[in-house]
């Protein structure tokens, strides 16, 4: 049975079950629903509706005599219902959280590491879930300065600073004959010709130059340009995670083994990057629930994510990771508001 095939009463019962379970992680009974939500039918009718919802895969019954709990399918219905009904209204408390965050971010705008650390910590503090932020991909940022430092005969440290103030170091292999003086000249060439251009633009131009030099100039120039190209290639690896302390106290993670599993998952940078790869950087908040996640290790969680930008250019993503039994209305509003606040800070 699809959501669109549910009648209005059934939808209201399903919404009530999910909302009740989010508020209190105990199986929900028909009598409780009837009293709390004031349904004008008897508890037996509600029980029959809940039984039909179980058959349709929206609810499950942990014990024969117990009430029902939502499945991933029920949480998806609940989230879609929230969006369709536009059940979003910022409370005074949420407005204060955003105002305080905006003030803090303005003070930190010249220190990207502190900026994103503050964002994830504040997001986690406000929700009691894990706050995550994927920093801007190096390719999307503009070059501020590059320096080359000879480390060993055939090794050079490339120090790349982008327009966001993020510093990247990389060790690259070079031909042994190159001197520090030549490296300084090379850095001057890059800084003079490519300052303010994105790393992608620089690499594209270097590829063209390398092809030309192979035809017209000597191999030495080609090698130098290849070294520049390698120096400007970085894998995307900067992910900030805050709030493990908060989820430790959620009843959803009271099992010590489950908590260890969570800790192992969020410490795996490869998995975190894989998670972000599956979140498109469009204009909308995205909610991924349990089994919907293509990354198997995250199927015990729900993810709420939103892109942040600099003006109209998407730079990265911020996200919440929490239990499927999540306060979706509040979490969606906060993630959306945090992303907008970060965008304003980066765009001003």
UniProtKB/Swiss-Prot annotation:
Record keywords, A-Z: Repressor, Stress response, Transcription, Transcription regulation
Record Pfam families: HrcA (PF01628)
Gene Ontology biological-process annotations: negative regulation of DNA-templated transcription
InterPro entries, alphabetized: GAF-like_dom_sf, HrcA, HrcA_C, WH-like_DNA-bd_sf, WH_DNA-bd_sf, WHTH_transcript_rep_HrcA_IDD
One term of GO molecular function: DNA binding
Organism domain of life: Bacteria
Function of the protein: Negative regulator of class I heat shock genes (grpE-dnaK-dnaJ and groELS operons). Prevents heat-shock induction of these operons.
Family as reported in the entry's similarity comment: Belongs to the HrcA family.
HAMAP family assigned: HrcA
Protein's recorded name: Heat-inducible transcription repressor HrcA
Species: Thermodesulfovibrio yellowstonii (strain ATCC 51303 / DSM 11347 / YP87)
Gene that encodes it: hrcA
